[in-house]
């Protein structure tokens, strides 16, 4: 099978193909960020990098059997302020559709898989009309400990959401975390990277860990092994959130926290890899910095979801 991966990132698509038990003859990728490319090359030395997606022409490629990609989503996401197709990053979707159309002219049986964030219906409709397939909504929480709703467009036959594996945060957390330098406050220990404003959202009262919310009750109780989101400590409408037994959706900053044994902390890089169902140390290969690894993981795919989709190729 010859595969073309656009906006390839850290080549989670290649990993998912292997997880699905599929043989890859050639894997060609388009990626422009240095750190993800270094991680990809360290894990998959045979990947052929093609450069900027805007310069790729079907006439220059061998026969392609499968095109995959997750065009940049910042313009569709809440974090990207919902700029939609006016955001040049999200407009790169049309490069994906252009290349698919060009390749179909040479191979009418071409298969594709496109991933993006959950978005407004009117934007989803544009992609659906362009790709001429109905979207499939899958939450990574079915196969991981991460709440990550995503939308997929594919013409691979028979794709359905995977069965729930009932994976909880407690299943993927590292057991021994160095708490040296942690801050004691309100009867809890806090990761020092958590700001004072964010820490003020968390209190321990009557044996409960309470996360302040802009609700009538004023808080929600977090239990051991719950994910916490303290990213908006000054917001009058959002404030803190609790995700029961799961992490929040990872993004390029991976700012979510977890409550474990009276400690409120950020996830380790290994835990972030596990939340995306990557092998431990996958992003350590290639020499990327910790910050680059975190960004690459948050921008990537949940490998187990993609593998379930690819299993329909057998």
What name fits each language-model region?
Residues 1-314:
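Conserved active-site and SAM-binding loop architecture
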């Amino acid at each position: 099978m010859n595969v073309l991966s656009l906006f390839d990132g850290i080549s989670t698509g290649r990993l998912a193909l292997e997880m699905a038990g599929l043989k890859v003859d050639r894997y060609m990728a388009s990626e422009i960020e240095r750190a993800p490319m270094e991680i990809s090359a360290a894990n998959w030395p045979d990947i052929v990098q093609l450069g900027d997606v805007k310069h790729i022409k079907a006439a220059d490629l061998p026969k392609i059997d499968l095109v995959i990609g997750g065009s940049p989503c910042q313009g569709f996401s809440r974090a990207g302020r919902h700029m939609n197709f006016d955001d040049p990053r999200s407009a790169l979707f049309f490069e994906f559709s252009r290349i698919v159309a060009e390749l179909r002219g040479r191979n009418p049986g071409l298969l594709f898989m496109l991933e993006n964030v959950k978005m407004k219906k009117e934007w989803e409709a544009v992609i659906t009309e362009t790709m001429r397939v109905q979207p499939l909504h899958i939450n990574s929480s079915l196969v991981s400990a991460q709440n990550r709703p995503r939308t997929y467009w594919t013409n691979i036959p028979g794709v359905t959401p995977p069965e729930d594996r009932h994976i909880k945060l407690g299943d993927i957390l590292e057991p021994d975390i160095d708490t040296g330098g942690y801050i004691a406050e309100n009867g809890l220990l806090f990761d020092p990277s958590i700001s004072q404003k964010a820490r003020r959202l968390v209190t321990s009262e009557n044996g409960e860990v309470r996360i302040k919310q802009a609700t009538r009750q004023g808080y929600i109780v977090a239990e051991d092994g719950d994910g916490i989101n303290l990213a908006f400590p000054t917001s009058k409408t959002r404030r803190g959130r609790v995700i029961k037994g799961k992490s929040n959706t990872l993004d390029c900053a991976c700012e979510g926290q977890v409550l474990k044994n009276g400690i409120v902390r950020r996830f380790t890089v290994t835990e972030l890899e596990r939340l995306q169902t990557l092998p431990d140390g996958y992003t350590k290969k290639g020499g990327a910095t910790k910050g680059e690894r975190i960004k690459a993981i948050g921008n990537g795919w949940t490998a187990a979801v993609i593998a379930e989709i690819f299993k329909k190729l057998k």
